[in-house]
């Protein structure tokens, strides 16, 4: 298999067929980092914010906060997964239709979503949720002391407690990052086994794991290449955001004040957020197209050659 030709073909598909961009946006839908940066600035810029957070943690409505926040996070995770599933399902079906010599249409996307989006959603939940829970477990030893200190209006945390929390966070990084890469590869193959072969949810996951075991060399070779491409795009976004933040902080022209008391041109942040989502859309469309081409050329061709 020529990986350069596969990636060039994926590039041509993304550049030529703009209908894919809509579903690439859905597949890669996530809050832009510019929004996270703005929220972080809001928390640190207002001198009253620590006191407000303390009141929320220990005030009369604290029970509602401790119960409602996890439920809200779970609901956000499910909504996010559902939106992503719609995009992934349509992208796989449309790229496959292109490779069969037919034009991609919204009708094809709709039929694929009606038939397979529910299964794709379950695949994502079954693979991502355990990883998310494990990540949370590793963060708890550091997060709990921080929340306790905020609730008790303390500015310091005992050194051994911090060291223990940092140890578990570092251990979690060493475990979660390789696991997330492996799960991503299983998910990509399982998605295509579901949409292109019509497999059930659990059968698709089992097939994705079996395909990695049987064809680990090609899967790893493509996966590392795509991981590098996504990493470069992510690094570009992070560097651009930091440059923008520095430019805003040094701007001599009186910047606008936000409702949180944070100074910063909202128009610039909004523009950057849109640009970030555009880059993420293109990258997600390219990655999905590459995996679909890989699945067709290697795994489906292997099956067709089997007696």
What are these regions (language model features)?
Residues 1-307:
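Hydrophobic alpha-helical membrane segments
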């Amino acid at each position: 298999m020529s990986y350069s030709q596969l990636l060039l073909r994926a590039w041509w598909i993304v550049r030529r067929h703009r209908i894919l961009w809509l579903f690439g946006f859905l597949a890669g839908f996530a809050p832009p980092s510019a929004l996270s940066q703005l929220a972080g600035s809001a928390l640190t810029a207002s001198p009253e914010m620590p006191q407000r957070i303390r009141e929320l943690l220990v005030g009369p409505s604290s029970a509602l906060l401790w119960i409602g926040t996890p439920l809200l996070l779970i609901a956000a995770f499910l909504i996010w997964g559902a939106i992503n599933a719609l995009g992934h399902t349509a992208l796989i079906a449309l790229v496959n239709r292109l490779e069969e010599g037919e034009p991609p249409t919204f009708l094809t996307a709709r039929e694929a979503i009606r038939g397979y989006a529910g299964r794709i959603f379950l695949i994502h939940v079954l693979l991502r949720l355990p990883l998310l829970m494990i990540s949370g477990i590793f963060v708890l030893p550091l997060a709990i002391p921080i929340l306790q200190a905020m609730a008790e209006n303390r500015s310091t945390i005992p050194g051994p407690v911090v060291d223990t929390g940092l140890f578990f966070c570092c251990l979690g990084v060493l475990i979660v990052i390789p696991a997330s890469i492996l799960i991503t590869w299983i998910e990509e193959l399982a998605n295509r086994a579901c949409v292109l072969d019509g497999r059930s949810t659990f059968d698709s996951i089992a097939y994705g794991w079996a395909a990695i075991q049987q064809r680990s060399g090609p899967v790893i070779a493509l996966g590392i290449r795509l991981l590098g491409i996504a990493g470069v795009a992510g690094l570009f976004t992070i560097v651009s955001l930091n440059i923008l933040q520095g430019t805003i902080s040094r701007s001599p022209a009186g910047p606008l004040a936000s409702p949180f008391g944070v100074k910063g041109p909202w128009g610039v942040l909004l523009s950057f957020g849109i640009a970030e989502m555009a880059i993420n859309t293109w990258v997600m469309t390219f990655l999905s197209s590459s995996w679909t081409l890989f699945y067709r050329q290697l795994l489906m061709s292997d099956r067709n050659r089997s007696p």
